[in-house]
Structures are given as structure tokens and as C-alpha cells.
Regions:
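Hydrophobic side chains in well-ordered alpha-helices
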Residues: 50-53, 87, 214, 238
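Structural beta->alpha junctions
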Residues: 71-77, 193-195, 227-235
């Protein structure tokens, strides 16, 4: 007879009439195993849910694919790339690409009467998909930003607003250093909160035109292009296809 089966039968059945009797120790062990499995399943579900939430927030701030200069991996102070209408159309026509949008960045500093905060001013145009920030907007509005005019409106995070004691409608003085120190006064029209501190403590959103002027760039130059995909699982193959497409559009500025 199989040894394991023999031991199991001895534990499971009593000597009196082969009645099924589950000793308390066995019952407790079974309950413990069931609880342990439940905790493991719950833990895995929480980890998967947290991972998905973090991924969605990263994508919300920067989309699935970013096309930019190679120095963008080291700094938000980047050299521009030229993005023509034909290039945008070609990227948008690529299978798997849901949406295409331009952006420009400029590192700077916010200064109030008694505090200061480093930040990155992100300029976006009218085509920017704002659904992510609208979902996380807690005060004010998320306006349609412009690529042809500077409205001096800005959307900031609650984390920065709380740290600098700012509120909706306040005007903030921002400073940027390149060849010289440049200043811009911006009006807070919206406050967002994603609870993703790595980004909430960093990004302000404003007109693409304003950031391009601070960078002294041509109207068709930007820090990069963000691409939203239909299917995250096809990210790798779409990235290779997009790389081939970008290679067909040389930068006229070198």
C-alpha cells in the first residue's frame, strides 16, 4: 500500500466503525492552509493592481512611446527635434497608434516671498489628450493650451501648491536659466493630484508656445512627440515600426 495513502486513512478515519472523524489538529491545519492561500491570492491581486495603477500613471504623464533627442534620457533641458505636419500625419496613420501629441519641456524654479521649488514646465499644444489630467483635476479647469500664443496660464499639482502655499488664481513667478536668467509670471488656472509623487512634485503644464519661446526654438521644434497606443502588449513591435518611420523624416535643422 502507498505509505502516504495509509497515513492519510489512519488520520482521517477512526477505529470505531470507520466513521469519518476529522481531528481538531487536522481541521485547524486545513483552515490554516485555506487562509494562507487566500492571503497569497489577495497579495498577488494587490501587487498586480498596484503595478497596473503605476503603469497607467506613468503612461498618463508620458504616453506609451516618446520620440525625442537622445539627451532627453539625461535631462529635461534637451536639444529640440523638428516635427513637421507630414511627420505627425505619418505617425498618426501608423497601425496601432491611437493618438499623437507634441510637447516641450523647460526646467526652472518657482519662487514665492518665503520659499522656492524646482520644477519642469511642460508645454503642450491643442492636440494634447487631456483626459488623464482632467480625471485628476481637483480644482479649476484644464484649458486647451496653444502652440501659437502664450496665455501665461498654468496647471500645477496639489503637492507643489501645498508646499508653496499657493491657491487657484494666484500668480507665480518662475525663473529659467539658459544663457541668462529669464522670468515669467504665470496664473494658476487648475490644480491636479495624481498621488504619484515623482511627477506631482515636478510638472507644471502650460502653452507649448510659451515653452518654445523660453527655449528660443522655431515653431516646428519641440522636445518630443508622445504616442498613445491601442494595445500595450504590442508596444515593442510598434516601437520598431515607429523608429523606421521616424528615420524617413530627416531633421531640417540638423
Amino acid at each position: 500500500m502507498n505509505l502516504e495513502l495509509f497515513i492519510a486513512e489512519k488520520i482521517h478515519f477512526s477505529k470505531e466503525g470507520d466513521r469519518e472523524v476529522t481531528p481538531p489538529a487536522v481541521r485547524i491545519a486545513m483552515i490554516g492552509i485555506a487562509l494562507g492561500l487566500a492571503v497569497m491570492i489577495l497579495s498577488v491581486a494587490i501587487v498586480i493592481g498596484f503595478k497596473k495603477e503605476v503603469r497607467n500613471k506613468v503612461i498618463g504623464f508620458g504616453s506609451h512611446i516618446q520620440i525625442s533627442n537622445s539627451d532627453a534620457a539625461r535631462s529635461f533641458e534637451t536639444r529640440p527635434i523638428a516635427v513637421t505636419d507630414s511627420m505627425l500625419a505619418a505617425l498618426a496613420d501608423n497601425s496601432g497608434v491611437k493618438h499623437v501629441q507634441r510637447y516641450s519641456t523647460k526646467p526652472g524654479m518657482i519662487k514665492t516671498s518665503d520659499a522656492f521649488q524646482g520644477m519642469v514646465l511642460k508645454g503642450i499644444g491643442p492636440e494634447y489628450g487631456s483626459s488623464f489630467f482632467r480625471r485628476h483635476l481637483i480644482e479649476g479647469e484644464f484649458p486647451q493650451f496653444s502652440d501659437s500664443a502664450s496665455t501665461n496660464r498654468v496647471v500645477i499639482s496639489k503637492a507643489i501648491a501645498d508646499k508653496l502655499k499657493l491657491k487657484l488664481g494666484d500668480k507665480i513667478d518662475t525663473y529659467y536659466i539658459q544663457d541668462d536668467v529669464r522670468a515669467r509670471r504665470l496664473t494658476i488656472v487648475g490644480i491636479y493630484q495624481t498621488n504619484f509623487s515623482e511627477y506631482d512634485n515636478l510638472f507644471l503644464l502650460t502653452d507649448l508656445c510659451l515653452v518654445n519661446r523660453l527655449n528660443k526654438w522655431h515653431p516646428d521644434q519641440v522636445s518630443g512627440v508622445e504616442l498613445e497606443l491601442y494595445d500595450y502588449d504590442k508596444l515593442e513591435e510598434t516601437t520598431y515600426r515607429i523608429a523606421d518611420e521616424v528615420g524617413r523624416h530627416p531633421d531640417p535643422y540638423g
